[in-house]
């Protein structure tokens, strides 16, 4: 075998391992950039990126997604979704399982959810729309350090609700909008224990059996609770 043939043979035999080593680059699940993407033993989609957005069309067995800088979009996810970005928005079209989403700088939108939701934003608004008639436990925790929060639930959704709205400006312009019969109270004194003086508007109450725990917390933002 001459040198040219030997070189060609070496390239052909090493090609499969070279392609395997490129997994995560140009993945159909991502928008490019350096990433590590894989499918878990149970079929879940797992993507971790050092920078750039993530776009997953369908994750029927769950998804664990994270990026150090970029937005994350999921079309449809079942079972569970664990999503985190250090700088960008999170958008989920439809989730039938549990959702745990966190962003350090952006909004969170879940267009339709049929399970428990935990959504935390360090600097953006949150919008969640719970649908369906499932009797499973569907606790909801929504928290923003600076933005509006809007939660929509089915009209007969049983819940134990606690809402805390803090504002730091003397000319109060924020409010809790709800028609669920919650008790609403506003503090009279400025609380300086958190550094920046703030006042609180709180709302609480039980709707139906109170089966599902709903907690909503925001700073300098409105809270809207819809029942439909």
Where are the regions a protein language model picked out?
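Intrinsically disordered, low-complexity terminal regions
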Residues: 1-228
């Amino acid at each position: 075998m001459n040198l040219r043939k030997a070189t060609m043979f070496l390239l052909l035999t090493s090609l499969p391992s070279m392609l395997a080593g490129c997994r995560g680059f140009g993945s159909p699940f991502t928008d490019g950039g350096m990433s590590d993407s894989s499918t878990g033993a149970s079929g879940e989609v797992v993507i971790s990126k050092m920078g750039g957005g993530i776009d997953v069309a369908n994750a029927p067995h769950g998804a664990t997604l994270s990026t150090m800088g970029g937005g994350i979009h999921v079309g449809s996810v079942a079972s569970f979704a664990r999503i985190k970005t250090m700088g960008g928005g999170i958008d989920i079209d439809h989730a039938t399982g549990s959702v745990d989403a966190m962003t350090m700088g952006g909004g969170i939108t879940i267009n339709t959810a049929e399970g428990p939701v935990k959504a935390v934003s360090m600097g953006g608004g949150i919008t969640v729309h719970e649908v369906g008639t499932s009797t499973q436990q569907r606790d909801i925790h929504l928290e923003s350090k600076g933005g509006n929060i809007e939660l929509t639930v089915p009209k007969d959704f049983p819940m134990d609700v606690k809402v805390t709205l803090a504002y730091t400006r003397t000319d109060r312009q924020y409010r809790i909008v709800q028609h669920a019969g919650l008790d609403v109270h506003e503090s009279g004194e400025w609380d300086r224990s958190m550094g920046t003086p703030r006042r609180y508007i709180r709302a609480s109450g039980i709707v139906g059996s109170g089966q599902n725990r709903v907690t909503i917390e925001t700073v300098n933002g409105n809270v809207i609770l819809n029942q439909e």
